[in-house]
Curated annotation (Swiss-Prot):
Pathway(s) per entry: Amino-acid biosynthesis; L-methionine biosynthesis via de novo pathway; L-homocysteine from O-acetyl-L-homoserine: step 1/1
Pfam families, per database record: Cys_Met_Meta_PP (PF01053)
An example Gene Ontology biological process: L-homocysteine biosynthetic process
Species whose genome carries this gene: Leptospira meyeri
Annotated GO CC locations: cytoplasm
Catalytic activity: O-acetyl-L-homoserine + hydrogen sulfide = L-homocysteine + acetate
Residue numbers carrying N6-(pyridoxal phosphate)lysine: 216
Protein name (database record): O-acetyl-L-homoserine sulfhydrylase
Top-level division of the source organism's lineage: Bacteria
Region (Disordered), start-end ranges: 1-32
GO molecular function: cysteine synthase activity; O-acetylhomoserine sulfhydrylase activity; pyridoxal phosphate binding
Keyword Transferase: yes
Enzyme Commission number: 2.5.1.-
């Protein structure tokens, strides 16, 4: 069994099986069952003609690990299969994945419409760095999909949002925003890190491109940094708005990505124009390649993704229910609570009835009480990550979203007493005792 990118998948396997087998056949030389770690920089060509064909994109194969690697290739195929995409590109971090995905589409003088409910690092990238590259970003309230249309103009080239806003946990109506994107004629790019592909598949609901921080739930153990871009193969890059796909690329002697790879017969006639351009232009020139070792470690995490997400979700729901009843808590955000304002939308997209590991809540008394609560936790670790097997806690206003202004923080759902938990896999009784003890002392 292997995954996307032209390899046959003889049966329509379920996600639990894909997580273990996708993208791989046992190594034909060594017969190794586990995915081998190819810790190498480069690869021997058969002869000079073979090398020339590879460099000219007349044949696909390994050239240099900045562009591709056999271990990383398995990871890419496996995650693409989990998301229902045609192909994927792994990168050095989630931040580099979203950067490459957007720069593969948008050029200087063009614009992006993005949700304002974003991870702080993403907001900084779009708000501060992209304008330095000549790219303007309009931030909108995603609760009304029409806001994306209202902020669009003839320079708009992409819509960007997160499935679940981090840390606000507002659920994007993917299908509704996708409808607007299609009418405007631009791709919808979705960060699906928070729910993982086991809980939500944005491509199924109309997204065109999906990105992940592999560091989080796909890796799952807080050991390795990585990111990934998944191409749904659904977008028409030849609609007249994307000259970077339809005009000749001088660095490949006039090759036109849409013309050659928009319906690529060696891959079964699928559209791989976006993901191939991201690899052979963006990754080639900007260079944020994932290390083979990190790819190998993340693969170990992917194998247990379904099991972990079920436990994460079960524990998080119990935590949310506990906090909702506690007298020292002002309010709780968790899309799995039937009382949550996002519950109906979340239920529409979380088809398994599982809503992930992240719980947000406001402690009565504001910032000082929130800090005292976090400092009183013993089982939870205070650190800037989510998706670890261990339970984590953070105060976003003073950390992940510190560089935002007050109004920007509020727009992102970050209030002074707001705490974000990434609920781990520990015994739920131990988790609840730790929370109760910390709350007693504030």
């Amino acid at each position: 069994m292997v995954g996307p990118s032209g390899e046959s998948m003889p049966r329509n396997f379920k996600p639990e099986t894909i997580a273990l087998h996708g993208g791989q056949e046992p190594d034909p030389t060594t017969t190794s069952r586990a995915v081998p770690l190819y810790q190498t920089t480069s690869y021997v060509f058969k002869d000079t003609d073979h090398a020339a064909r590879l460099f000219g994109l007349q044949e696909f194969g390994n050239i240099y690990t900045r562009l591709m690697n056999p271990t990383t290739d398995v990871l890419e195929k496996r995650v693409a299969a989990l998301e229902g995409g045609v192909a994927a590109l792994a990168t050095a971090s989630g931040q580099s994945a979203e950067m490459l995905a957007l720069l593969n589409i948008v050029e200087a003088g063009q614009e992006i419409v993005a949700s304002s409910s974003l991870y702080g690092g993403t907001y900084n990238l779009l708000h501060y760095t992209f304008p330095k590259l000549g790219i303007k970003v309009h931030f909108v309230d995603q609760s009304d999909p029409e806001n994306f249309r209202k902020a669009s103009n003839d320079k708009t080239r992409a819509f960007y949002a997160e499935t679940l806003g981090n840390p606000k946990l507002d659920t994007l109506d993917i299908a509704a925003v996708s409808k607007v994107a299609k009418e405007v004629g631009v791709p919808l790019v979705i960060d699906n890190t928070m729910p993982s592909p086991y809980l939500v598949n944005p491509l199924k609901h109309g997204a065109d491109i999906v990105v992940h921080s592999l560091t989080k739930f796909l890796g799952g153990h807080g050991t390795s940094i990585g990111g990934i871009i998944i191409d749904g193969g659904s977008f028409n890059w030849g609609n007249g708005k994307f000259k970077n796909f339809t005009e000749p690329d001088p660095s490949y002697h006039g090759l036109k990505f849409w013309e050659v790879f928009g319906k690529f017969e060696p891959f079964g006639g699928v559209n791989i124009a976006f993901i191939l351009k991201a690899r052979v232009q963006g990754l080639r020139d900007l260079g944020p390649a994932i290390s083979p070792f990190n790819a190998w470690q993340i693969l170990q995490g992917v194998e247990t993704l379904p099991l972990r997400m079920e436990r994460h979700s079960g524990n998080a729901l119990k935590v949310a229910e506990f906090l909702q009843k506690h007298p020292k808590i002002e309010w709780v955000n968790y899309p799995g609570l039937s009382t949550d304002k996002n519950y109906a939308t979340a239920k529409k997209y979380h088809e398994r009835g599982l809503f992930g590991a992240i719980v947000g809540f406001e402690i009565k008394g504001g910032v000082e009480k929130a800090k005292k609560f976090i400092d009183g936790l013993e089982l939870f670790s205070l650190l800037a990550n989510i998706g670890d097997a261990k339970s984590l806690a953070i105060h976003p206003a003073s950390t992940t979203h510190q560089q935002l202004t007050g109004p920007e923080q509020i727009s992102a759902g970050v209030t002074p007493g707001f705490v974000r938990l990434s609920v781990g896999l520990e015994n739920i009784d131990d988790i609840l005792v730790d929370l109760e003890e910390a709350l007693k002392n504030i």
